[in-house]
Amino acid sequence: MKHYESYFYSTRDRDTRHAASAILDAVFPLLPRVSSVADVGCGVGVWLSVLREKGVETLQGFDGFWVEDGQLEIPVEMLKRVDLEQPLQWPVRYDLLLSLEVAEHLPPERAAGFVEDLTKASDYVLFSAAIPRQGGYHHVNERWQSFWAGLFAGRGYSPVDCVRPRFWNDDSIPCWYSQNMLLYVKDGAPLKHPPVYPMPLDVVHPAAYLGKVNHPDFRYGLSLAKRAILHKYFGKPF
């Protein structure tokens, strides 16, 4: 799994803190008491720092060796450096596990094992991963939400759509969270007030779509295709 450069974190983290607070406020009321949380692929620890502000007692982050100590939003001892491409070992289980926009960075052959690792650590997994053509730095395994749901189902976990419907029209939340994030709950685990109106699993957020079709590279490609068609069928200069 390749690392992010320092500028990536400094830019993205400003957009993440508000989203983390709002989303956690929506998820926590559904769960039994949350006193321990782990974040797999935590980056510089923005979500963990928000959890700390909310009074969660036990917090643990997991990410690679490329995350610099000086960038961290959490105490250094709260981060355990691991290779996410290898099986993860859990000394304890957690009340809630996070893995947000991480799985798409891991090789396709790691997908099933990664989900297995997550489910070994908690009955509740808040998960999001990039969909096909979402784009991003070193995305090597972009999959539809239903792909991941199938892997979780194989481990006895079902998706609870408590984030996407609530924040779909909220422009202050990054669209990849509103598009991709699902709470996976172990079958039989207690859940308060489950959402009544879940969305289809495989969806594309309008903001993500517009970001693609308005990108200069996409528009240039369309112009080339148009010129090629006019040249082939109408003899116009290419």
Residue ranges of each PLM-predicted region?
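A short His-aromatic
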Residues: 105-106
